[in-house]
């Protein structure tokens, strides 16, 4: 798996975060939450690709993706990822 795949996932995450910011400014809060989740998911999948050198799993579970990518997270962050996963 090339670094380009990881970079593509991360570029998508950045674009989705921009969309989320625009939705927030427009007061489309539920749509904003969805794109925040999507941005986090893509960023975590970029990490998974970089660390495992394989395609990321077909999953929207942010904590699972963080675990697979070896992301160190305390309990508060894990709870945040669990909550954010409900916005998908």
Residue locations for each model-derived region?
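Terminal alpha-helical segments
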Residues: 1-88
């Amino acid at each position: 798996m090339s670094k380009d795949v990881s970079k593509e996932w991360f570029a998508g995450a950045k674009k989705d975060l921009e969309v989320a910011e625009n939705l927030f400014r427009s007061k489309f809060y539920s749509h904003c939450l969805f794109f925040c989740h999507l941005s986090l998911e893509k960023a975590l999948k970029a990490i998974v690709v970089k660390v495992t050198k394989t395609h990321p799993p077909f999953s929207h579970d942010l904590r699972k993706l963080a675990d697979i990518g070896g992301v160190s997270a305390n309990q508060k962050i894990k709870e945040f990822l669990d909550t954010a996963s409900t916005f998908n």
